[in-house]
């Protein structure tokens, strides 16, 4: 009953998921676990509410500068990998830093894709370790 009532709340929602849900990284379990649950919930809501016209999609992004991934965290993660901060932020197949604008475009794409549900759009420049399999 509770999740059925949530359908009205989620009619206009998109979920944000991160690569943590697929590739948590060492010592990041407590951070990644809720994201893994959100990935499953996104898929479950697509199954439960698709017949009501409610769409549930996610964006799987990686290494986006934010309140959590700030300059200090970037320096720390780069140092742990013995690379520069620039190499860390561009550490993907395209060797391009993924920006918040790139993620926003993914959300917009899903928002206007009226016949898409249960999808997870990856915006990470190509992080094979975090790809959905």
Residues of each region from the PLM?
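Conserved catalytic-site region of short-chain dehydrogenase/reductase
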Residues: 21-24, 129
